[in-house]
Amino acid sequence: MAKIVRFGVSIEEDLLENFDKIIEDKGYNSRSEAIRDLIRDYIIKEKWNLKKEKVAGSISLIYEHDVYGLSEKLTDIQHHYHDVIISTLHVHLDEKNCMEVILVRGKVEKIKRLYDELSSLKWVRHTNIAITDII
């Protein structure tokens, strides 16, 4: 485990009160835990913006399965990015809609291109990405 370093933060009283309420509602044991999570999230977002670091995560999308050629297009795109795709999960949500969850690991730039290609397809109703740092 990494060495813990103590440091001080100056903050407006009302901002701190709001923060304390949120961390209590979420069940954090301390402000330090919550601040560490916020810093980790910020670092991951910056890595995403810089497009240089390696990350892991998931891309989820919802689409209509009966649209001619869409399933094949999704498969073709995934084969093009086989080097960053770890695994996929396909779920039939109802008679019309499917959900695909794609687990990814690799350079941010390539994962972002995969996400953008999937998001831009017509009849893909919703896409979402969740990433984390590879420690």
UniProtKB/Swiss-Prot annotation:
Residue positions binding Ni(2+): H79, H90, H92, C98
GO BP: regulation of DNA-templated transcription; response to nickel cation
Cofactor binding description: Binds 1 nickel ion per subunit.
Keyword terms, alphabetized: DNA-binding, Metal-binding, Nickel, Transcription, Transcription regulation
Signal peptide: none
GO molecular function: DNA binding; DNA-binding transcription factor activity; nickel cation binding
Keyword Lipid metabolism recorded: no
InterPro entries, A to Z: Acetolactate_synth/TF_NikR_C, ACT-like_dom_sf, Arc_rbn_hlx_hlx, CopG, CopG/NikR_regulator, Ni_resp_reg_NikR, Ribbon_hlx_hlx, TF_NikR_Ni-bd_C
Domain of life: Bacteria
CDD domains membership: RHH_NikR_HicB-like
Obligatory cofactor(s): Ni(2+)
NCBIfam families named among the record's database cross-references: PRK00630.1 (NF001884), PRK01002.1 (NF002169), PRK02967.1 (NF002815), PRK04460.1 (NF003381)
Record's function text: Transcriptional regulator.
Family assignment from sequence similarity: Belongs to the transcriptional regulatory CopG/NikR family.
Protein's name in the database: Putative nickel-responsive regulator
Organism name: Dictyoglomus turgidum (strain DSM 6724 / Z-1310)
Lineage: Bacteria, Pseudomonadati, Dictyoglomota, Dictyoglomia, Dictyoglomales
